[in-house]
From Swiss-Prot:
InterPro entries: IE68. It comes from Human herpesvirus 1 (strain 17) (HHV-1). It is found in: Host nucleus. This is Transcriptional regulator ICP22. Pfam families: Herpes_IE68. Belongs to the herpesviridae ICP22 family. Residues 41-68, 104-116 have a biased composition (Acidic residues). One of its GO terms (biological process) is regulation of gene expression. Residues 1-172, 315-341, 373-393 are annotated as: Disordered. ICP22 and protein US1.5 mRNAs are transcribed from two different promoters on the US1 gene. It comes from the Viruses.
Length: 420
């Protein structure tokens, strides 16, 4: 039998079974199942991808099954037997990535083999699910998890509508309650509170520029207020507001109401003094009071007024000391002029005689904090010797100055009185 060359039957084979070019890898339009928006487990996603790959593999094997049924060997088809001879079908070789790229036309206008829709899709980014898998909000369709803030029951409950303006009845009831509250708080003398306030004022004046003169002013002021009330000499409510520099404010209104309420409870025994001159020197408020000393020294400064006050206090102390020294000496002529029973001196003497001057703390009336230490018998006088006075002055620096009374100081040292 003559040898038959494979080239003689090659055209017949090609005409009988034309070679089909396999499409470029990745150009086939594939329909992938759309991934759900909600989060699923990784097992479900992997299973879907595996089923998709298997379906594509099965479709490729079905299409190529009719063309070549022989198994592949090393990526190439097995040789076919034709007319006692074997030959390789080079047209049916599997394509590689390089051949696929070369087979694709570089011309962008050439759309004979594939369309613009057949472009392989880009790899999608990994989806970040912000919803917790085990969160109870999953059934409510909440994308973000709950915040850590827990709402109180007060916020969840519906609020009642607030009235835009108070009713006239409510305003009337409120005014009645305020009037009752003011009437119940009636003024009563509080001696303990007065003593604490005076003690605090003395402490503040210790660090002043002129502590001695400022303390004397405070003592004289409280003494005059007491004697003024004892003699039933009173000021009008508006004059008190001017004196305390609170006229025209809320404090002034409360002060006037308190004074009028107390005056209505007691009988008035004297006409109110309404004339009160204003302070013409440096002032610390809208209106101030002038004492008898400052009326004639209205053009002087505060330092000159303080010096004049100290000189006046020193003169009174010197007079009292000289009187105490001459009490022991017998007087050649003794003329006693008794005071009338209703005079101011007799009334003050009777009241002072009823006071308990024991040194126990808390047993003294508030007047003792005012009268005590107003003068001292240890101050140098014209008849005192210099050496003796120097020793006594050094002794005075160790404690409070002696009071004008026979007993010791009722208050602790440096708590109430100023050191010299």
């Amino acid at each position: 039998m003559a040898d038959i060359s494979p080239g003689a039957f090659a055209p017949c084979v090609k005409a009988r079974r034309p070679a089909l070019r396999s499409p470029p890898l990745g150009t086939r339009k594939r329909k992938r199942p759309s991934r759900p928006l909600s989060s699923e487990s990784e097992v479900e996603s992997d299973t879907a991808l595996e089923s998709e790959v298997e379906s594509e593999t099965a479709s490729d094997s079905t299409e190529s099954g009719d063309q070549d049924e022989a198994p592949r060997i090393g990526g190439r088809r097995a040789p076919r037997r034709l007319g006692g001879r074997f030959f390789l079908d080079m047209s049916a070789e599997s394509t590689t990535g390089t051949e696929t790229d070369a087979s694709v036309s570089d011309d962008p206008d050439d759309t004979s083999d594939w369309s613009y829709d057949d472009i392989p899709p880009r790899p999608k980014r990994a989806r970040v699910n912000l919803r917790l898998t085990s969160s109870p909000d999953r059934r409510d369709g909440v994308i973000f998890p709950k915040m850590g803030r827990v709402r109180s029951t007060r916020e969840t409950q519906p609020r009642a509508p607030t009235p835009s303006a108070p009713s006239p009845n409510a305003m009337l009831r409120r005014s009645v309650r305020q009037a009752q509250r003011r009437s119940s708080a009636r003024w009563t003398p509080d001696l303990g509170y007065m003593r604490q306030c005076i003690n605090q004022l003395f402490r503040v004046l210790r660090v002043a520029r002129d502590p001695h003169g400022s303390a004397n002013r405070l003592r004289h002021l409280i003494r005059d207020c007491y004697l003024m009330g004892y003699c039933r000499a009173r000021l009008a409510p508006r004059t008190w507001c001017r004196l305390l520099q609170v006229s025209g404010g809320t404090w002034g209104m409360h002060l006037r109401n308190t004074i009028r309420e107390v005056e209505a409870r007691f009988d008035a025994t004297a006409e109110p003094v309404c004339k009160l001159p204003c302070l013409e020197t440096r002032r610390y408020g809208p209106e101030c009071d002038l004492s008898n000393l400052e009326i004639h020294l209205s053009a002087t400064s505060d330092d000159e007024i303080s010096d004049a006050t100290d000189l006046e206090a020193a003169g009174s102390d010197h007079t009292l000391a000289s009187q105490s020294d001459t009490e022991d000496a017998p007087s050649p002529v003794t003329l006693e002029t008794p005071e009338p029973r209703g005079s101011l001196a007799v009334r003050l003497e009777d009241e002072f005689g009823e006071f308990d001057w024991t040194p126990q703390e808390g047993s003294q009336p508030w007047l003792s904090a005012v009268v005590a230490d107003t003068s001292s018998v240890e101050r140098p006088g014209p008849s005192d010797s210099g050496a003796g006075r120097a020793a006594e002055d050094r002794k005075c620096l160790d404690g409070c100055r002696k009071m004008r009374f026979s007993t010791a100081c009722p208050y602790p040292c440096s708590d109430t009185f100023l050191r010299p």
